[in-house]
């Protein structure tokens, strides 16, 4: 039986990051976590490029452009959607989630979901480096692992 399991070797990995400016107080912490993870796993600064977009809804388009460019082995998507008093939250969460998944499936490269979808600011803060860790860090580590699984599969 052959088992494919990702490792955290980051040799020659190029990473694109899409970060939403809306809720930048939270997203900047997610980005800091992602960059910390990449640095800890020896991804060179020159191998990371960041594109800022207005909000979470715009993430999938730029993730798709990055994936189509063939410059990156993985794309990390970072944002924070915090529930308000209208149904807008539900629409944004659904479309961002579907959009990011679609880009990954269409492009064949890992497009990591580091978009927080929380009921309140406290939950977002907890997931951006407080009690529950940093989901940006987790997305970056996941990106490295996924790149290595794909390399093992020979695709």
Curated annotation (Swiss-Prot):
It comes from the Archaea. (2S)-2-hydroxy-3-oxobutyl phosphate binds at residues 85-86, 127. 5-amino-6-(D-ribitylamino)uracil binds at residues 22, 56-58, 80-82, 113. SUPFAM superfamilies: Lumazine synthase. One of its GO terms (molecular function) is 6,7-dimethyl-8-ribityllumazine synthase activity. CDD domains: Lumazine_synthase-I (cd09209). It catalyses: (2S)-2-hydroxy-3-oxobutyl phosphate + 5-amino-6-(D-ribitylamino)uracil = 6,7-dimethyl-8-(1-D-ribityl)lumazine + phosphate + 2 H2O + H(+). Keywords: Riboflavin biosynthesis, Transferase. GO terms for cellular component: cytosol; riboflavin synthase complex. Pathway: Cofactor biosynthesis; riboflavin biosynthesis; riboflavin from 2-hydroxy-3-oxobutyl phosphate and 5-amino-6-(D-ribitylamino)uracil: step 1/2. This is 6,7-dimethyl-8-ribityllumazine synthase. The gene is ribH.
